[in-house]
């Protein structure tokens, strides 16, 4: 898989990531992944600023996909242990997988939650079931943060890394776009790439999100740093300037020279090592 080869290739070549910024601001940084990646990829994630890396074995998973509450409960335990030993703030990236494909079999069929209506495609129904479970678990997680750590401020940013496969049943023509990706690249403005992000605060007032819709993902780390009130690096400030100049677009920014110049400055300043 080219994605995994890229992680190994880029190990040690990124000098300014969001977790690295967090480290500079005194944060402990942790990553909870759903995969069995500790042996292969812990080096990459540590190289971009994660102090601790918990793969599926470290988290005690017993099956491919656990309910979201499993990973949230692990975080609550990790943070409770951290807070007992240190007053440092903590930045954590948590992966979840319960809403992921495949949808041909019910996930935790004993759990009764809303799905689709009578005429809903079976896979769409299953996806909606899992989204209902995910929404319940997420709200419960926020409530646990609120009650378990009264007065502790949290900024919780959630986002989807890709669209669910069931979109092929919901949007005519999208399946053809997705199936053609390997044969012919599709434009970055395609619906096939659109997902979501959201920010919630616990004992923390979240500033207004950028007005741009869509917002390309290369801007998200700088947006998170700004929402959290962190000091912004020169590169982060430039990303936010480009966000405004390009109206939220990055790959399809009309000012291509500005994007290329930004990439060149990242390389020339050794923020990204190109050799």
Region spans (language model):
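Solvent-exposed soluble domains appended to multi-pass membrane proteins
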Residues: 1-275
């Amino acid at each position: 898989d080219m994605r995994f080869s890229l992680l190994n290739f880029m190990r040690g070549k990124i000098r300014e990531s969001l977790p690295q910024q967090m480290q500079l601001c005194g944060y402990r940084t942790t990553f909870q992944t759903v995969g069995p990646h500790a042996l292969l990829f812990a080096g990459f994630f540590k190289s971009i600023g994660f102090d601790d890396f918990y793969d599926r074995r470290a988290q005690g998973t017993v099956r491919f996909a656990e309910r979201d509450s499993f990973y949230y409960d692990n975080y609550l335990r990790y943070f409770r242990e951290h807070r007992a030993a240190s007053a440092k703030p903590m930045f954590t990236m948590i992966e979840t997988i319960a809403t992921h494909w495949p949808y041909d079999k019910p996930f935790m069929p004993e759990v009764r939650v809303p799905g689709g209506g009578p005429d809903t495609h079976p896979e769409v129904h299953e996806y909606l079931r899992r989204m209902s479970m995910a929404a319940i678990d997420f709200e419960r997680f926020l409530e646990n943060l609120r009650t378990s750590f009264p007065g502790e401020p949290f900024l919780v940013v959630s986002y989807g890394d890709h669209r669910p496969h069931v979109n092929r049943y919901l949007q005519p023509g999208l399946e053809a776009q997705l199936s053609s990706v390997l044969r012919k690249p599709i434009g970055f403005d395609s619906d096939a790439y659109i997902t979501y992000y959201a920010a919630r605060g616990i004992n923390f007032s979240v500033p207004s999100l950028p007005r741009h819709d869509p917002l390309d993902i290369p801007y998200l780390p700088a947006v998170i740093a700004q929402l959290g009130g962190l000091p912004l690096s020169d590169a982060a400030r430039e990303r936010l300037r480009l966000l405004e100049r390009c109206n939220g677009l990055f790959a399809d920014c009309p000012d291509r020279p500005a994007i290329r110049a930004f990439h060149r400055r990242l390389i020339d300043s050794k923020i990204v090592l190109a050799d």
